[in-house]
Amino acid sequence: MGRCCFYTAGTLSLLLLVTSVTLLVARVFQKAVDQTIEKNMVLQNGTKVFNSWEKPPLPVYIQFYFFNVTNPEEILQGEIPLLEEVGPYTYRELRNKANIQFGENGTTISAVTNKAYVFERNQSVGDPNVDLIRTINIPLLTVVDLAQLTLLRELIEAMLKAYQQKLFVIHTVHELLWGYKDEILSLVHIFKPDVSPNFGLFYERNGTNDGEYVFLTGEDNYLNFSKIVEWNGKTSLDWWTTDTCNMINGTDGDSFHPLISKDEVLYLFPSDLCRSVHITFSSFENVEGLPAFRYKVPAEILANTSENAGFCIPEGNCMDSGVLNISICKNGAPIIMSFPHFYQADEKFVSAIKGMHPNKEEHESFVDINPLTGIILRGAKRFQINTYVRKLDDFVETGDIRTMVFPVMYLNESVLIDKETANQLKSVINTTLVVTNIPYIIMALGVFFGLVFTWLACRGQGSMDEGTADERAPLIRT
């Protein structure tokens, strides 16, 4: 009986160890999990993945911070602007996909993303309908720039004088965000109908969408999950001067493909920035007990490099690192994008304004992604809207102002997975961990039986060393 147990333990130990090593080397269970995820992460009507894509369950908030101008007269005399940050004014962002249509072969799906904003008073510093902000007159600057390029110059000069337009204006937060009717724009609209009579930093963005997208469903390849192939009927942009800069790359930022490697560079197309951007791995994170890869927008995105030369408008007219001229896609308004407080921009932009305090924690854009599922656990998209201003001798409204990139406001669009969704995701991840750890469980059993085998071997040797008195007696006695 003892000898039988001895051989059984040894055989089981060897068999289990060989099996576990074979399973680990062949990655049998890991491949099974990966294939299951790849198969399920497809945009198919009626699935959980599709429902989450159509109506994202995670709460999204957008915070607006304005820069109130405290020394307007001094600025017109050539002094440095002194700005005071006012905010946040927080809104809940409600989003859903609509007008959904699948392609004939199931590999594509078209949709628009509707967005609406609901004010959150308890997360804000004041009432946007009451609070006043003094800021630079972007409609005036837009019209002045228009006058440089058209035959309407004399007419525009006359209108500015007649209506006594000022370079700095006061409006409520609500007006600056969602729009108001501007006197000068209304007059220009009569002669140039493509110029809207209304102005707002997010005018016609509440309760609307940014156009139709065509996405890949991931049916043919999981790496293509929710990847954009068309936007507003175009497979590429036409604003920039090179084919590379005009490419529409990646997803819309709401989702990413599963099974992400930290060595990957991920791409996304935020239409409000008028270009595609890439994000790179930064660190390992833990969000609500879930593992995550933190990806960040690198400084090179807005760097003054040869790779970004195609974003210089007009061609060859490149600005210093940290800012992007997007006036070409904003109906000619002299809008310059940057990170908040000119974070990661050239020092010249920071020092030109009193009140800029860039720091990583508050002004960096990032996204924390669960690498197994590609689900976003936490994220913050932060960028600043500025305008380009300079002295123009023919327009007295500009006074003796310095040439500069003038901050208007910045936003922080953030998302954080809720506990209920996190617990559901934990259940999925824990199940996959159990499956992928089966080889280690088998190995542990092999080690256990190996120890039993060793113990039985030692016990058997001890039994041979210790016998009865008769067994130890010599066979031949004298």
Swiss-Prot record:
Consequence of substituting residue 105 to Q? Loss of glycosylation site. No effect on normal location in lysosomes
State the InterPro entries in the record.
CD36_fam, LimpII
Q: Name one Pfam family in it.
A: CD36
What is the protein's membrane topology class? Multi-pass membrane protein
Q: Which residues does the annotation flag as glycosylated? A: 45, 68, 105, 122, 206, 224, 249, 304, 325, 412, 430
Signal peptide residues are none
Outline the segment boundaries, as ranges, of region: Important for interaction with GBA1.
155-191
What results from changing residue 166 to D?
Answer: Abolishes interaction with GBA1. No effect on normal location in lysosomes
Sample GO molecular function, one term: cargo receptor activity
Q: Where are the transmembrane segments?
A: 5-27, 434-459
Q: How is it modified after translation?
A: Acylated by palmitic acid group(s). Heavily glycosylated.
The outcome of changing residue 412 to Q is: Loss of glycosylation site. No effect on normal location in lysosomes
What changing residue 159 to D does, per the record, is: Abolishes interaction with GBA1. No effect on normal location in lysosomes
Cystine pairs:
274-329, 312-318
Result after altering residue 184 to D: Abolishes interaction with GBA1. No effect on normal location in lysosomes
- Impact of altering residue 206 to Q? Loss of glycosylation site. No effect on normal location in lysosomes
Q: Name one GO cellular component term.
A: lysosomal lumen
Q: What is the effect of changing residue 163 to D?
A: Abolishes interaction with GBA1. No effect on normal location in lysosomes
Tell me the keywords, alphabetical order.
Disulfide bond, Glycoprotein, Lipoprotein, Lysosome, Membrane, Palmitate, Receptor, Transmembrane, Transmembrane helix
Tell me how this protein assembles.
Interacts with GBA1.
| Family designation | Belongs to the CD36 family.
What does this protein do, in the record's words?
Acts as a lysosomal receptor for glucosylceramidase (GBA1) targeting.
For this entry, the protein name equals Lysosome membrane protein 2
What organism is recorded for this protein? Answer: Mus musculus (Mouse)
